[in-house]
UniProtKB/Swiss-Prot annotation:
Domain of life: Bacteria
InterPro entries linked: Na-dicarboxylate_symporter, Na:dicarbo_symporter_sf, Ser_Thr_transp_SstT
Family the UniProt entry places it in: Belongs to the dicarboxylate/amino acid:cation symporter (DAACS) (TC 2.A.23) family.
Catalytic activity: L-serine(in) + Na(+)(in) = L-serine(out) + Na(+)(out); L-threonine(in) + Na(+)(in) = L-threonine(out) + Na(+)(out)
A Pfam entry, by short name: SDF
Protein's cellular compartments: Cell inner membrane
Molecular-function GO terms, alphabetical: neutral L-amino acid:sodium symporter activity
Annotated TM spans: 13-33, 43-63, 82-102, 141-161, 185-205, 217-237, 298-318, 339-359
Main localization category: membrane
Gene name of this polypeptide: sstT
Listed name of the protein: Serine/threonine transporter SstT
Species per Swiss-Prot/TrEMBL record: Shewanella amazonensis (strain ATCC BAA-1098 / SB2B)
Function: Involved in the import of serine and threonine into the cell, with the concomitant import of sodium (symport system).
A biological process from GO: serine transport
UniProt keyword annotations, A-Z: Amino-acid transport, Cell inner membrane, Cell membrane, Membrane, Symport, Transmembrane, Transmembrane helix, Transport
Length: 405
């Protein structure tokens, strides 16, 4: 009996990762035992994701403004190398997806087109949407969680307050600290929230619908695994010149797991901010790089766009040469960086990539519908890769800067 109490005490008071693991097991068990009961606890997951999404825009705006307003003159923020890592990582992901698609060609059973979807007409429209998000009304940006706009206004307000009185800067810092405390409280609810998410997902899908797309999922998840465990560690090693895997596994464990179940990079911003704080990274850096990464660091999206497009190409018997494949990698990488500016994310950028091969919009939308069918796995894995990489590259750039100093 005392042993059981000890185990329960360790689970309740131990690491958040262990508590989340217990929540996952409990969710799977409940869904297997009683799907009806599992559906009844779905609201726990919705509440958790809703709380994260609610606090994230406020956190980003206040933290960015506070960090820049209180920044010491001449301090290094390391943003240039982080942005370069984001872009290199996204392009490498698209290239890896091309190689995986050629190595394991996949045919699709095309289904009805995704009803009501409204994909962008071209890369210009994607970039145009992003540009207008930059000058969005700040109140509207807060309400709609427009992180591009929040970053722009946060940076602008921070710069404007650089020469404000000390009391004003202290007030801004105190507000930032208060919001961070709220975030910590919400993150403590992760095990309960993930329990609800897992139970509801398994009860509602059962994963039977995914069996017909086993090979497609294999290529998608295989490409994401190569990026997470081979390419990203290689990039980080070149940056920090030491074994990257302890950092890689920490980011996947403490950021990727939560992102996998929330399926939202925006909702995972507070989790990533808290992880950066535990890693003792520069607040001036991660307060900007993490929300920026949630917007433009889209390795998972690049893989999804590339793999599904090449699956459609293979299904239709279209020949693809090396030059076209490389061009697809570039288009997928650029499109992925704009995925946050498109309702529906990476899946609705597939018609844009399909147009490179002359595939009609009707067929492209059937490919999108396939994407929605496997979304319970694809979207979760994509978000986990995207979000954990934000912290990984931020930490790598900060460590590299410290090593040079």
């Amino acid at each position: 009996m005392s042993t059981e109490k000890s185990l329960l005490a360790n689970a309740a008071g131990g690491s958040l990762v262990l508590q989340i693991f217990v929540g996952i097991i409990a969710g799977v068990a409940l869904a297997g035992f009683s799907p009806e009961a599992a559906n009844q606890v779905a609201f726990l997951g919705d509440l958790f994701v809703g709380a994260l999404k609610a606090i994230a825009p406020v956190l980003v705006f206040v933290l960015v403004a506070s960090s820049i307003a209180n920044q010491v003159s001449g301090a290094q923020t390391n943003m240039r190398p982080i942005i370069l890592l984001y872009l290199v990582g996204t392009f490498a992901a698209a290239l890896t997806a091309v190689l995986m698609s050629f190595a394991f060609p996949t045919s699709l059973v095309l289904i009805d087109a995704a009803a009501g979807a409204n994909p962008p007409e071209g890369i210009g429209q994607v970039l145009n949407t992003l540009l207008f998000k930059l000058v969005d009304n700040p109140v509207n940006a807060l309400i709609n969680a427009n992180y591009i706009g929040l970053l722009a206004w946060g940076v602008g307000l921070g710069i404007a307050l650089r020469h404000a009185s000390t009391s004003t800067k202290n007030m801004l810092h105190d507000v930032s600290h208060g919001v961070s405390q709220l975030v910590r409280f919400v993150i403590c609810l992760a095990p309960i929230g993930i329990f609800g998410l897992v139970a509801a997902t398994i009860a509602q899908t059962g994963f039977e619908a995914l069996a017909a797309y086993a090979q497609l999922l294999g290529v998608l998840l295989g490409a994401m695994a190569v990026i997470a465990f081979v390419v990203n560690p290689l990039i980080v090693f070149l940056k920090i010149r030491r074994n990257p895997y302890p950092l890689v596994f920490k980011c996947l464990r403490e950021s990727g797991v939560t992102a996998f179940f929330t399926r939202s990079s925006a909702a995972n911003i507070p989790v990533n901010m808290a992880l950066c704080e535990r890693l003792k990274l520069h607040e001036d850096t991660y307060s900007v790089s993490i929300p920026l990464g949630a917007t433009i660091n889209m390795a998972g999206a690049a893989i999804t766009i590339t793999v599904l497009t090449l699956a459609a190409v293979h299904t239709l018997g279209i020949e693809v040469d090396l030059a076209t494949a490389l061009l697809l990698s570039v288009i997928a990488a650029v499109s992925a960086c704009g995925a946050s500016g498109v309702a529906g994310g990476s899946l609705l950028l597939i018609p844009l990539a399909c147009s490179l091969f002359g595939i009609s919009n009707d067929i492209a939308m059937q490919v999108v519908a396939v994407g929605f069918t496997i979304g319970v796995i694809q979207d979760s894995a994509e978000t986990a890769l995207n979000s954990s990489t934000d912290v990984l590259f931020t930490a790598a750039a900060c460590e590299a800067a410290e090593r040079k100093a």
